[in-house]
Curated annotation (Swiss-Prot):
Pfam families for this protein: BURP
Tissue: Expressed in stems, leaves, shoot, panicles and stamen.
PANTHER family (UniProt xref): BURP DOMAIN PROTEIN RD22 (PTHR31236:SF2), BURP DOMAIN PROTEIN USPL1-LIKE (PTHR31236)
The protein, known as: BURP domain-containing protein 3
Organism: Oryza sativa subsp. japonica
Residue ranges, annotated region (Disordered): 59-81
Signal peptide range: 1-21
Keywords: Signal
Domain BURP: 213-428
SMART domains per the UniProt record, alphabetical: BURP
PROSITE patterns tied to this protein: BURP
Length: 429
């Protein structure tokens, strides 16, 4: 009987451990934070069931579900049904392809047998997207793609078989990528929310996050600010903690990491991933506690351990209309977003470009978090999260905030709005 009881206890223990290990990131969140809803900025990064590939850009801007390794059964939706692509199973070439945008905004029909895109033309709405591929170009020479009013512009100079001379712009500078001809290094701007770094000239002129910085004295109803609210990454999915913890994550392992994810060395993506690793390995600023969360579970653990309680709230900026351009917003309401005294402690987690979801999280002291309601000139409503840093003495004197706001470290509180895919954690009570 004793042996039977021991076997039963052992079986139950193994089952319990197995059940714990098999919990999804969402289940872990609900277990650790039963009274805290998960923000949409994080829930959209959770992997979908069924093994199908899913890609999200921005706040649902592009959604791709590929049920098969070949184009049979592929479905692509942009926005709320903005673009629908259905490729009939069994066609190895683009025969039978149909693309519909909005209410017939774009219709593309490629007849079977055309192996090259000679003369192909795609137009969306009133010039929303224009693609013109000149006949005879087997490579991307002469290709031009424009989305919205400059929403995305891609220009590939003729004769470059590789990404030499490629320029990509999203929104009005939402994402800027400049790839120089072969043999030249790829430049990637440093993250503006890592305060040890000095700003580069390129960042000062081209990074839309620069406009997110402002002074606390300007945070009041009636104030007008020119802001472009965007997501800063392509929305890669979270890996479960067990998978993320098994992945190499070090600057010393860059070649192995790139190989594992089939990322070409020397590409923009490779440079961004290497910069993310450097960001994660950089020492904390004075009075800061930092870590990179490579899974949703590790983000929850860092936030709760840093704030010393499981009674926490996670919040992100929510924009009422996707794809809103840079415009003037008027502040309509401001309220404190955290419980506590005059000087709050909070954890901010900033999305970093990587092969899967990675967030640079840091605990900051002498900070205040605000929930800010804003109305855009075009009527777009925004519920923004703003963070104000009362002590900036330990920041790099050439940080982008000081150069844009024309102030010196440690003199006045410096504030910034959060991009849509960043998260702030505060105590809830």
């Amino acid at each position: 009987m004793d042996r039977l009881l021991a076997c039963l206890l052992g079986f139950l223990l193994i089952a319990s451990v197995g059940s714990h290990a098999a919990r999804t990131p969402e289940q872990y969140w609900k277990s650790a934070l039963p009274n805290s809803p998960i923000p949409s900025s994080l829930s959209q990064l959770l992997s979908t069931a069924g093994g199908g590939t899913s890609v999200n850009v921005g706040g649902g801007g592009v959604h791709v579900d590929a049920g098969h390794g070949k184009p049979g059964g592929t479905t692509v939706d942009v926005g709320k049904g903005g673009v629908g692509v259905n490729v009939k199973p069994g066609y190895g070439k683009p025969g039978g392809t149909t693309v519909g945008v909005g209410k017939g905004g774009v219709g593309v029909n490629v007849k079977p047998g055309y192996g090259k895109p000679g003369g192909t033309s795609v137009g969306v709405g009133k010039g929303g997207v224009g693609v013109n591929v000149q006949p005879g170009y087997g490579k991307p020479g002469g290709t031009t793609v424009g989305v919205g009013k400059g929403g995305v512009g891609v220009n590939v100079q003729p004769g470059y078989g590789k990404p030499g001379g490629t320029t990509v712009g999203v929104g009005k500078g939402g994402v800027g990528v400049n790839v120089k001809p072969r043999g030249k290094p790829v430049h990637v701007n440093v993250a503006p929310f890592i305060y040890n770094y000095a700003a580069t000239e390129t960042q000062l002129h081209d990074d839309p996050n620069v406009a997110l910085f402002f002074l606390e004295k300007d945070l009041h109803p009636g104030k007008t600010m020119a802001v472009h609210f965007t997501a800063t990454t392509a929305g890669e999915k979270f890996l479960p903690r067990s998978e993320a913890d098994a992945m190499p994550f070090s600057s010393e392992k860059v070649p192995e990491i790139l190989s594992r994810f089939s990322v070409k060395p020397g590409s923009v993506e490779a440079a961004e991933m290497a910069q993310t690793l450097r960001d994660c390995e950089a020492p904390p600023a004075q009075g800061e506690r930092k870590a990179c969360a490579t899974s949703l579970e590790s983000m929850v653990d860092f936030a709760t351990s840093s704030l010393g309680t499981s009674h926490v709230r996670a919040a992100s900026t929510v924009v009422g209309k996707e794809g809103s351009p840079e415009q003037e917003y008027t502040v309509t309401a401001v309220k404190r977003a955290a419980a506590g005294g005059d000087q709050d402690q909070l954890v901010a987690c900033h999305a970093e470009p990587y092969a899967y979801a990675v967030f640079a999280c840091h605990l900051t002291r002498a900070t205040r978090a605000y929930a800010v309601s804003m109305a855009g000139r075009d009527g777009t409503g925004v519920e923004a999260v703003a963070v104000c840093h009362a002590d900036t003495a330990g920041w790099n004197p050439k940080h982008v905030a000081f150069q844009v706001l024309k102030v010196k470290p440690g003199t006045v509180p410096v504030c910034h709005f959060l991009p849509q895919d960043h998260v702030v954690w505060t105590r809830s009570g």
